[in-house]
Amino acid sequence: MRLRGRGPRAAPSSSSGAGDARRLAPPGRNPFVHELRLSALQKAQVAFMTLTLFPIRLLFAAFMMLLAWPFALLASLGPPDKEPEQPLALWRKVVDFLLKAIMRTMWFAGGFHRVAVKGRQALPTEAAILTLAPHSSYFDAIPVTMTMSSIVMKAESRDIPIWGTLIRYIRPVFVSRSDQDSRRKTVEEIKRRAQSNGKWPQIMIFPEGTCTNRTCLITFKPGAFIPGVPVQPVVLRYPNKLDTITWTWQGPGALKILWLTLCQFQNQVEIEFLPVYCPSEEEKRNPALYASNVRRVMAKALGVSVTDYTFEDCQLALAEGQLRLPADTCLLEFARLVRGLGLKPENLEKDLDKYSESARMKRGEKIRLPEFAAYLEVPVSDALEDMFSLFDESGGGEIDLREYVVALSVVCRPSQTLATIQLAFKMYGSPEDGSIDEANLSCILKTALGVSELTVTDLFQAIDQEDKGRITFDDFCGFAEMYPDYAEDYLYPDQTHFDSCAQTPPAPTPNGFCIDFSPENSDFGRKNSCKKAD
């Protein structure tokens, strides 16, 4: 598979929003991966700080949290859904000031000596919702503690000792994963607060729904834009020489990020409040368009590209299995294009056998774009051409359908490595015994990993113990059971990043204040018909 599609393509945009903006090409880096490499001098600094300033900073931060707890407890007494009193009582203003001061002192002790603020924060009557991006770390809580704005959080967070009390003080909107109707209720609550004419605190929302490495802005969830009220975009920057801030699904874990950040002499953060964005009537009717146009405004301010990757792509990148996707995989782009054609991977999985049989019958015969469109039963479109180009490695205008089915199998069931390999053996295997040669194995694994270059000679020879020049699925399966780390040992023996980028997250969501609350049955996405091949 090719690592890039055909490049930038014009995308229509509402005249009321971003104007003649263009959808940029997929980013060169996987937005869900962060690789942190320290020089010898930086390692020496971390070692020195670990023995000196780090424990002091950590203990002081914990002390400040404990100091803030009684004030937050006092101010959070009473029913959480009761409208705040207007104007605020003097004692509440004092508590609010004290909590902001305590939190700012905590961040200062952690090395955030100066927080640069650009622009003006809008009044609640001007913009009830603040949309923050890019979301890259739990340190993004800094603007929350500086403004004491409400946020959207998972309901489990309120039961955490001390932290839960501090959370309740800012009157967040809670989302319960156990309540199937919770997302709809959350959107309704946000809408109610947003239309209260400033009676409620502003709500800060991270519309990306997950953490990225700040190289681009991924798709914004429409939840923050469904109320159809003006929003104020807020962009975050961390202009540090060494990026110890970024906390993505693949990369350093939460504790390591905390340790390395507190071991820096100084950490920088910039918060820029952009002008309030007032939606047009068209955007009020179409929250997805509203979200897209706000994203373009924020991307322009940041100087980064936009991409249609989503939280689901993040899950694909981190799926467990013997073949973990490398950082330069193009399967994320493939998954985006699948959705762009209106094909939902969760609905396609049951038809994979039918797809593979259709591809097997062609015996490797190449097809052109019109035939590919007929195979998928979709019209020829820009998205289809981009997908076609991913498999047209030679640029000759022809592709092998078997590669498409292998890639689709990975996207539909990313954790089931052997199921994908077995499906591939059925398509590539000889009619006599289902065996494949080294060239077939190379094609299968390159497609399954979404890379254009891969050497499989060592792996093939290790499996082919009898030196027959061909292997069966049983041979492969037996070898995989004996050597479950065969990918690292035989495919990437010299690439240390393959291990370091493959960390499994502890929970389905990256943190408590960045969850997706958009209704699952939302009609605000693409409405292409979902057709399947026979």
Swiss-Prot record:
<dbReference type="GO" id="GO:0043129">
    <property type="term" value="P:surfactant homeostasis"/>
</dbReference>
<feature type="domain" description="EF-hand 1">
    <location>
        <begin position="379"/>
        <end position="414"/>
    </location>
</feature>
<comment type="function">
    <text>Exhibits both acyltransferase and acetyltransferase activities. Activity is calcium-independent. Catalyzes the conversion of lysophosphatidylcholine (1-acyl-sn-glycero-3-phosphocholine or LPC) into phosphatidylcholine (1,2-diacyl-sn-glycero-3-phosphocholine or PC). Catalyzes the conversion 1-acyl-sn-glycerol-3-phosphate (lysophosphatidic acid or LPA) into 1,2-diacyl-sn-glycerol-3-phosphate (phosphatidic acid or PA) by incorporating an acyl moiety at the sn-2 position of the glycerol backbone.</text>
</comment>
<dbReference type="GO" id="GO:0008654">
    <property type="term" value="P:phospholipid biosynthetic process"/>
</dbReference>
<dbReference type="GO" id="GO:0000139">
    <property type="term" value="C:Golgi membrane"/>
</dbReference>
<keyword id="KW-0444">Lipid biosynthesis</keyword>
<dbReference type="Pfam" id="PF13833">
    <property type="entry name" value="EF-hand_8"/>
</dbReference>
<feature type="topological domain" description="Lumenal">
    <location>
        <begin position="79"/>
        <end position="534"/>
    </location>
</feature>
<dbReference type="GO" id="GO:0045732">
    <property type="term" value="P:positive regulation of protein catabolic process"/>
</dbReference>
<feature type="compositionally biased region" description="Low complexity">
    <location>
        <begin position="8"/>
        <end position="19"/>
    </location>
</feature>
<keyword id="KW-0106">Calcium</keyword>
<dbReference type="Pfam" id="PF01553">
    <property type="entry name" value="Acyltransferase"/>
</dbReference>
<dbReference type="GO" id="GO:0030163">
    <property type="term" value="P:protein catabolic process"/>
</dbReference>
<dbReference type="GO" id="GO:0005509">
    <property type="term" value="F:calcium ion binding"/>
</dbReference>
<protein>
    <recommendedName>
        <fullName>Lysophosphatidylcholine acyltransferase 1</fullName>
        <ecNumber>2.3.1.23</ecNumber>
        <ecNumber>2.3.1.51</ecNumber>
        <ecNumber>2.3.1.25</ecNumber>
        <ecNumber>2.3.1.67</ecNumber>
    </recommendedName>
</protein>
<keyword id="KW-1003">Cell membrane</keyword>
<keyword id="KW-0808">Transferase</keyword>
<keyword id="KW-0551">Lipid droplet</keyword>
<feature type="short sequence motif" description="Di-lysine motif">
    <location>
        <begin position="531"/>
        <end position="534"/>
    </location>
</feature>
<dbReference type="GO" id="GO:0005886">
    <property type="term" value="C:plasma membrane"/>
</dbReference>
<keyword id="KW-0472">Membrane</keyword>
<keyword id="KW-1208">Phospholipid metabolism</keyword>
<dbReference type="InterPro" id="IPR002048">
    <property type="entry name" value="EF_hand_dom"/>
</dbReference>
<keyword id="KW-0443">Lipid metabolism</keyword>
<dbReference type="GO" id="GO:0047159">
    <property type="term" value="F:plasmalogen synthase activity"/>
</dbReference>
<dbReference type="GO" id="GO:0060041">
    <property type="term" value="P:retina development in camera-type eye"/>
</dbReference>
<feature type="binding site">
    <location>
        <position position="398"/>
    </location>
    <ligand>
        <name>Ca(2+)</name>
    </ligand>
</feature>
<dbReference type="GO" id="GO:0047184">
    <property type="term" value="F:1-acylglycerophosphocholine O-acyltransferase activity"/>
</dbReference>
<dbReference type="GO" id="GO:0003841">
    <property type="term" value="F:1-acylglycerol-3-phosphate O-acyltransferase activity"/>
</dbReference>
<dbReference type="GO" id="GO:0047192">
    <property type="term" value="F:1-alkylglycerophosphocholine O-acetyltransferase activity"/>
</dbReference>
<feature type="topological domain" description="Cytoplasmic">
    <location>
        <begin position="1"/>
        <end position="57"/>
    </location>
</feature>
<keyword id="KW-0677">Repeat</keyword>
<dbReference type="GO" id="GO:0005789">
    <property type="term" value="C:endoplasmic reticulum membrane"/>
</dbReference>
<keyword id="KW-0479">Metal-binding</keyword>
<dbReference type="InterPro" id="IPR045252">
    <property type="entry name" value="LPCAT1-like"/>
</dbReference>
<dbReference type="GO" id="GO:0047191">
    <property type="term" value="F:1-alkylglycerophosphocholine O-acyltransferase activity"/>
</dbReference>
<feature type="binding site">
    <location>
        <position position="392"/>
    </location>
    <ligand>
        <name>Ca(2+)</name>
    </ligand>
</feature>
<feature type="binding site">
    <location>
        <position position="394"/>
    </location>
    <ligand>
        <name>Ca(2+)</name>
    </ligand>
</feature>
<keyword id="KW-0812">Transmembrane</keyword>
<dbReference type="GO" id="GO:0006656">
    <property type="term" value="P:phosphatidylcholine biosynthetic process"/>
</dbReference>
<comment type="similarity">
    <text>Belongs to the 1-acyl-sn-glycerol-3-phosphate acyltransferase family.</text>
</comment>
<feature type="domain" description="EF-hand 2">
    <location>
        <begin position="451"/>
        <end position="486"/>
    </location>
</feature>
